[in-house]
Amino acid sequence: MTQHGFHAGQSRVRRASDDADVIVVGAGPGGSSAAYHLARAGLDVLLLEKSTFPREKVCGDGLTPRAVKQLVGMGITLEPADGWFPNKGIRIIGGGVRIELDWPELSSYPGFGLVRTRRGFDEIVARAAEGAGARLAEGVTVTGPVLDEETGRITGVIVRDTGDGVVTSDGAATGDRVAADDGAAGGERTYRARLVVAADGNSSRLSLAMGLRKRDDRPLGVAIRTYYTSPRHDDDYLETWLELRDGNALLPGYGWIFGIGDGTSNVGLGLLNTSASFAHTDYRAMLRSWLATMPAEWGFTEETRIAPVRGAALPMGFNRTPHYTRGLLLVGDAGGMVNPFNGEGISTAMESGEIAAQVIIQALARPDQASTELALQGYPQALKDAYGGYYTLGRKFVGAIGHPWFMQFATRHGLPRPTLMRFTMKLLANLTEPRGGDAADRVINALSKITPAA
């Protein structure tokens, strides 16, 4: 296989360069997107990943049309024969109502979504970055930043091998391989770069080391998921249930059943911290209780569960800022870019990676450090232009649905109204025409524009 970084022919080992134009820490969707676009522009990019592929990530595995657009833009083929399972839209169940909403037909986004497990998805996107010319190093843990003693600016990272004797590809057409500088597994070494992108997830130790902490005034979600063998594996809608309860109180979150198309389904639930129940919820017990209400023939039982129940935090609405400081740019979960409306973070991770790359490309083309820095300082504003007002609306939304009475009212009176629900789907998935469009598009875009940025 020769597409997206899987190179044919013999590989040869060479020693790694200790520097690059840009170091990207984390080869998830955001980091790999940034690395791809930077490498395509001809920059020397070192993409560092602490795990080795393939690896697991807690996720619903559902990809909205916004994420599909990013994949297409990276030249990734999305054929069902290659493991991409398409879907038509979302099915919502709640309050005795069941409604199917197709993804909107827009000129700006494809009219379909996909499902692909993160075990395969992340590697495909990372290999696309590798194929574009980025040097991908797997099994490498970043232990801290290298700082300029005078300015405090990040000039590189300190790394340590996981102990697997990792060998990593540089993405060259010949399939060259990059070996550790010191040749010893577990040895620390330093990589230097003009700029560093933090794409190291919700915990983002690199951001913390640079003094960037999470904001308590932004929403946070928690999601858990597992996998079952099930006859529902080939459902062509992403199914969501607004039926999570604490006693009789309806909670701000949803359960999901996403067919993967391979005989299995991703099943999980997510809850927002705007609920009074958030801190003391037993999520695994809630999942068991919810699944106990499902028809037996769907097969969601302990006997058909094929993976552990795993959980992860969902950092939302720019919950870590600033997104640029002293040579470090944040993308994806590291910058708290999960959509507060629906808990989806893959599309925004990939989009923010592309935005960061475009800012970096322009900045590094400047003739001096002062003008380069001026361009880099535009990155937070570029993110605010893309998401700021929309995320502020999202914060108001999650605050409202944190009240059980509001959640009950919205479910009872909103779901039976298809026109309202089509509007709601566009709002929650952030799927509108940027210019023109229908009345729903114009209303959503206007609200996002006039609302103060997050």
Spans of features found by a protein language model:
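Conserved Rossmann-like nucleotide-cofactor binding loop
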Residues: G30, F53, S203
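A conserved beta-strand/loop capping segment in the N-terminal third of enzymes
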Residues: V68, G73-E123
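C-terminal helical "tail/cap" subdomain of flavin- and related membrane-associated enzymes
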Residues: I361-A454
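Glycine-rich FAD pyrophosphate-binding loop
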Residues: A39-C59
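FAD/FMN-dependent oxidoreductases across multiple families
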Residues: G83, S275-V359, A365, S371
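Conserved N-terminal glycine-rich FAD pyrophosphate-binding loop of Rossmann-like flavoproteins
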Residues: T52-M74
